[in-house]
């Protein structure tokens, strides 16, 4: 009797696990067969490198923002690391678009960082005129990046890239405003959203490269 009862309990436990949220997510995640196709090793590497570089972009963006607003002694060191990250991103596209294109992207991204530093400084000093000016310049730089990338790859539309970059700036601004208000929950939430979004941007870039250069994968 005890043995039969144990078997019944075990059966119900198995059924419960099969219908648990994780099991449901696993089924949903399997999706359509095309999405289950294995990525080629070189595609996996590009995706990983691109995601890592852009996640680093968010991490060091935040690190610099924290340091600059608090006037910490590590500000210059953090800025140097953040600027190096833009070189890392430029280097990722060099095997596909060449040295000149990679350096051009790096230069545009470094400008993005430099303008962002001015935005942070103006916001910290509550200088509304400068904040408005530098914010407009920030979006102009985003337009330049979108235009450059879309001209290099027809799989990246200028409007799609603008939308992605504008969203990135919006989330950085949310993070900045939250830190200035000392609203730490909002700051963390903005960073989490920013990190999720930057992975989307990275994957769009990866997908475009794979489509344009299938023979390299």
Locate predicted features.
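Bacterial N-terminal signal peptides that target proteins for export
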Residues: 1-10
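Mid-length scaffold segments of soluble, non-membrane domains
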Residues: 99-134, 138-140
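C-terminal amphipathic alpha-helix
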Residues: 33-35, 42-47, 51-68, 82, ...
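Early exported N-terminus immediately downstream of N-terminal targeting peptides
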Residues: 58-88, 93, 101-111, 116
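Cleaved targeting-peptide boundary
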Residues: 26-34, 38
